[in-house]
Each structure stands twice: as C-alpha cells, then as structure tokens.
Amino acid sequence: MMSAPYASASGPAAATAFLTGAAGALPSRTVAVLEAIKRAILAGELKPGQALVEADLAEVLGVSKTPVREALKTLAGAGLVSMSPYKGAAVRVVDHEQARNLYDARLLIEPEALARAVAAGHDWRPAHQALQRADQAADQAERSLANRDFHRELYAGCGNPLLIHMLDDLRDQTALVSAAASCSQGGVRA
C-alpha cells in the first residue's frame, strides 16, 4: 500500500491504524495526515529537499488531496516544509547558520520553561516514561521520537501555552536538523 518514497518504517498497517483511529479516538484526517508526514520527516524517511507531491501522499495515506494540502501548509508554517510557487512542497533543507540559530533559540528558551515547570510542581512521570522508551527503543527513529517526547515533558508544565507552542516548533525544527545530519545526502548545507 505504501509506495517507496513515502514508505513508513512502521509499515502500512500502522499507518492505516493511525489514519483510521483504530488505536483510539478518530482524529481529523488533516491532523492524521499532518502527524504521519511530520513523523516521516523527523524520522528521516522523507529526506531534506525531497519533493512532497500531494497526489502521491494522498494515495499513500488513503485520503484526498485536501487534507494533504492543509497538512503541508501547516508544516510549512512550522518550518519543516518549504513551499515554492510552480514547484510545490519539499522537505526543508536547513543550512548551518539556520541550525545554529535554532539551537541557540532553544537553549535560551527551554531552561526558563523548565524552571517554571519545576516551580509549578510539574508531574515528571511522563518524562521518566519517555526516557524509558528511549532506552528500550528498537531503532534510532523510535529513540529520537522518545527523546523529543522527553524534552517536551520537561517544559510542558511551564504554565505558558505560547511558550510551549514556541518550544514545540523549535523542537521539531531541531529534530529536522538531526534527521538531516544523519542523511547520507547531507540535508544540512553550508
């Protein structure tokens, strides 16, 4: 069911279960498509610079082009996808300066959010569970996703939804840098 350029490491059955909501409440199609594409980008399954063809993604994910188009727009707004007139969408290619700027911003903001979460008495059990998932991960993609969850849990209790949203975007963009760095094609450019 999944074609080669968009194949998921977790396979067609997992993608189908995710899209149909078999594992829980039925998410909107756009949210499901958004999460599936984001996961593939951050896991390095979709490489930096790789074209994201709406029709192909729609076929692979078993949806119409509309939720794919909306998901790509949202991912472009989050800095994971670049949109070009007449060329369409592609996985964003990050240069070294952008990578440094992303990590710099995250290093400035995340410690403050963590300090606020500590002051608020945040429940650290989900962070601990994410660390355990990272330790037990079967592959690098699974470990990376658990690590992202761990970092999110560190700042999730800061009490400021805007700060959480900003850090979520920075976290995703730095994960893109990590995925790009691990690609043999060299998705981080000088």
List PLM regions with ranges.
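Short linear motifs at protein or domain termini
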Residues: 1-119
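C-terminal all-alpha effector/ligand-binding and dimerization domain
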Residues: 2-14, 25, 129-133, 179-190
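Flexible, glycine- and charge-enriched loops at secondary-structure boundaries
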Residues: 30, 140, 188
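Amphipathic, non-membrane alpha-helical segments in soluble helical-bundle scaffolds
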Residues: 69, 96-103, 124, 160, ...
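Conserved amphipathic alpha-helical segments that form helical-bundle/coiled-coil interaction surfaces
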Residues: 119-184
